[in-house]
């Protein structure tokens, strides 16, 4: 494929934008470098770049675009918002409609508050949990991404008995020491952390199904035990459903798994492609939020009509009968096709697939936590990513990220993708 215009634009972007991108995940650093493709437009399941190339898209903007690009119903809602004014700074009736829709879909959301992003939503749930419990520390799980605010840019110390250390320049040591990080799916480490730090722990922050070192499901009984142990300890449980809400069913991963948190943070899908976040939970906890309580949260753009109307339209699309069954069918088809192609070419892969989301790891071993995901072959994934791009398949540029199937993907798209996988695996073997 010709990418000369993408290269030209990236060179220009480097002169004006830090690193040439507005989010580091777009830089292709995770796949060994190379020029990121600059897209011109998107429609349905497809991207079209500035050089005129067409791609089947599984990036889905890192998750939000579950209905495909430029879905007519969502586009109509956004157009209506633009015509009537996109920002008021006052209440609107649409906020009420959307809050009711979220509450009906995810019953643990007894009260809801809108924010501008998933990062803001997670950040505020932690503040509210601290206000409710009177405690300061949180427990999180290694490798789970919860946004880019200081408190969650923390990596594990040497074990559950040690406090966290900064995972980014600019995060203070004192902030990192408010966080205890333990491995996902490791109940013994979680118990150890609670035994040592329990009386200081305000909340346990959990991705109920991990989406940020690939799609990794909780082992049987893990989330139930986390809930029980946290509550015995007087700590709250926060589910970060920024990736998972409405991903696997019309509702949250908590509905899908049957395990209920005290607070939930959301983003991505619920905006229909526009920036949004939301959080909610038990009434007695949510009443700690201003103006009813002492935990302050505000935002000029929070609940803006454009994002709210886009979100309402997105959820209306997701109520289509049989949609999630189709996600499951196509997800299973992709997993099966990738595994067969890998076996044909004697390439070791593990595919973690949950409904319409999957991750392809270059390893023969199961992946159930961040350490196992980190041990997979990133060099092979980088070659695979670049090969798939040349075959017209757009993936996330990181071995840790998921593929997302949208309502716009067809069976023909899935079959074409499987053929591309077979072709790329064949070339990878030849190159060796």
From Swiss-Prot:
GO terms for molecular function: glutamate-1-semialdehyde 2,1-aminomutase activity; pyridoxal phosphate binding; transaminase activity. The modification N6-(pyridoxal phosphate)lysine is found at residue 268. GO terms for biological process: protoporphyrinogen IX biosynthetic process. Its cofactor is pyridoxal 5'-phosphate. It catalyses: (S)-4-amino-5-oxopentanoate = 5-aminolevulinate. GO terms for cellular component: cytoplasm. Keywords: Cytoplasm, Isomerase, Porphyrin biosynthesis, Pyridoxal phosphate. It is an enzyme of class 5 (isomerase). Pathway: Porphyrin-containing compound metabolism; protoporphyrin-IX biosynthesis; 5-aminolevulinate from L-glutamyl-tRNA(Glu): step 2/2. It holds the Pfam family Aminotran_3. It is found in: Cytoplasm. PROSITE patterns: AA_TRANSFER_CLASS_3. Its main location: cytoplasm. The keyword Cytoplasm applies. The keyword Cytoplasm applies. Its EC number is 5.4.3.8. Homodimer. Belongs to the class-III pyridoxal-phosphate-dependent aminotransferase family. HemL subfamily. This is Glutamate-1-semialdehyde 2,1-aminomutase 2. It comes from Listeria monocytogenes serovar 1/2a (strain ATCC BAA-679 / EGD-e).
């Amino acid at each position: 494929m010709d990418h000369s215009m993408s290269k030209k634009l990236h060179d220009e972007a480097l002169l004006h934008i830090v690193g040439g991108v507005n989010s580091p995940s777009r830089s292709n650093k995770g796949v060994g470098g190379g020029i990121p493709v600059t897209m011109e437009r998107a429609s349905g399941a497809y991207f079209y770049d500035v050089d005129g190339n067409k791609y089947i898209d599984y990036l889905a903007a890192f998750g939000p675009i579950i209905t495909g690009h430029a879905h007519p119903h969502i586009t109509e809602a956004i157009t209506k918002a633009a015509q009537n004014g996109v920002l008021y700074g006052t209440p609107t009736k649409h906020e009420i409609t959307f809050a009711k829709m979220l509450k009906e879909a995810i019953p643990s959301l007894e009260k809801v508050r809108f924010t501008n992003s998933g990062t803001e939503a997670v950040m505020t749930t932690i503040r509210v949990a601290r206000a409710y419990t009177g405690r300061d520390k949180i427990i999180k799980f290694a490798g789970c991404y919860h946004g880019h605010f200081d408190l969650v840019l923390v990596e594990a110390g040497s074990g559950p008995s040690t406090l966290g250390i900064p995972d980014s320049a600019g995060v203070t040591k004192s902030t990192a020491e408010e966080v205890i990080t333990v491995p996902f799916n490791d109940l013994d480490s979680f118990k150890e952390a609670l035994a040592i730090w329990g009386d200081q722990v305000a909340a346990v922050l959990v991705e109920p199904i991990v989406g940020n070192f690939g799609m990794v499901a909780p082992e049987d009984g893990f989330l139930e035990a986390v809930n029980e142990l946290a509550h015995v300890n007087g700590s709250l449980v926060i589910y970060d459903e920024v990736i998972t809400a409405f991903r696997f069913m019309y509702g949250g991963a908590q509905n899908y798994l049957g395990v209920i948190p005290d607070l939930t943070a959301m983003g991505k899908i619920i905006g229909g492609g526009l920036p949004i976040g939301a959080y909610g939970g038990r009434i007695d906890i949510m009443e700690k939020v201003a103006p009813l309580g002492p935990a302050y949260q505000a935002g000029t753009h929070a609940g803006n009509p454009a994002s709210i109307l886009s979100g309402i339209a997105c959820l209306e699309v997701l109520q289509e009968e049989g949609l999630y069954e189709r996600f499951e069918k196509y997800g299973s088809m992709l997993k099966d096709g990738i595994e067969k192609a890998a076996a044909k070419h004697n390439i070791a892969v593990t595919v973690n697939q949950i409904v319409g989301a999957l991750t392809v790891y270059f390893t023969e071993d199961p992946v159930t936590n961040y350490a196992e995901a980190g041990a997979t072959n990133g060099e092979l994934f980088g070659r695979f990513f670049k090969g798939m791009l040349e075959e017209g398949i757009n993936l996330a540029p990181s071995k840790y990220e998921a593929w997302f199937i949208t309502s716009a993907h067809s069976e023909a798209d899935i079959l074409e993708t499987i053929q591309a996988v077979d072709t790329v695996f064949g070339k990878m073997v030849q190159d060796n």
